Amino acid sequence: MSGGDDLVLHNPVEDGELSAIFMIRNPSGIHVRPAGTIVKLFDGEDCEATFTYLGKTVNARSVMSILMLGASYNGEITVRIKGPSASRVMQKLAEVFNSGFGEL
């Protein structure tokens, strides 16, 4: 993926589940600040979400779980979200991933 189109959206994967692949654009990868930004996006949202990176899948609503992925620059994270808020949260995630978490 290149340019401004760093999101591949497949809708739906299963009943009500969304899936997307995001490229990590910020040079420092997913460290504490971006992980915290991601988790805050889920505040008040009714959905379940997972991130998969290099074959490892974790709860996307947990800073520690996200950090354990060790996701680095130019890596791709597969996101799966299910629930009433899935579409809204996926859009928010697209915005922060595509902005490089404000580190570009």
UniProtKB/Swiss-Prot annotation:
General (non sugar-specific) component of the phosphoenolpyruvate-dependent sugar phosphotransferase system (sugar PTS). This major carbohydrate active-transport system catalyzes the phosphorylation of incoming sugar substrates concomitantly with their translocation across the cell membrane. The phosphoryl group from phosphoenolpyruvate (PEP) is transferred to the phosphoryl carrier protein HPr by enzyme I. Phospho-HPr then transfers it to the PTS EIIA domain. Keywords: Cytoplasm, Phosphotransferase system, Sugar transport, Transport. It is found in: Cytoplasm. Belongs to the HPr family. It comes from Chlamydia muridarum (strain MoPn / Nigg). CDD domains: PTS-HPr_like. Gene3D superfamilies: HPr-like. The active site is at residue 31. It holds the Pfam family PTS-HPr. InterPro entries: HPr, HPr-like, HPr-like_sf, PTS_HPr_Ser_P_site. Its main location: cytoplasm. The keyword Electron transport does not apply. GO terms for biological process: phosphoenolpyruvate-dependent sugar phosphotransferase system. The keyword Transmembrane helix does not apply. Residues 17-104 form the HPr domain. This is Phosphocarrier protein HPr. GO terms for cellular component: cytoplasm.
